[in-house]
Amino acid sequence: MPKPKPSPRNRGNAIALLVIDFQIGLFEKPTPVYHAAEILVNANNLIQRAHLAGISVVYIQHCNDSFLQKDTPDWQLHQELLPPAENDLRIYKRHGSAFRDTYLEQELEARHVGDLLICGLVTHGCVRAACLDACQMGYRVTLAADAHSSFSKDAPRLIEEWNTRLAQAGVQVLPAGEINFTTEVALA
């Protein structure tokens, strides 16, 4: 039985799209990102639709002291991902969750965001952490089922497992093409 979600803590009705860790270094691991081309197409579709709908887009990039050092080639956003537009946010993180030790929550609050759409890498790491933390913080969360992935050899199983587990935790899991960019996202 899923845990009851906390009340929304006066979250607004605005929507934001979180684009998590689409970084070159993650696409160039020895085990390739599962369905990389499809994931990039679906993420770009979400970004385009968000921009057309006037929805905040937040690009999140992981920084560490090894292969994702800030400002190195591997740290950069994937060249096939649509680049951030002038009004898009960029958040740099050092932990799995985009909320931990960043100003993401403050930025979302300033924009009266209550609904989060999430896509990114990696399914069982940073995507999982962002979804669960956002639910715990009272956001209404929708994960694009076909716009997150992993470079694990077990990626198909992990994606299916985490789509199920996150849905049980209160995350709405939908194919990217079925996500409705309105304030009724959580009811789609």
Region locations from a protein language model:
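Short acidic, Gly/Ser-rich segments with clustered Asp/Glu that frequently serve as metal-coordination loops
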Residues: I24-K29
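Short glycine-enriched, charge-decorated loop/helix-capping segments at active-site entrances
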Residues: T31-A37, F67-L68
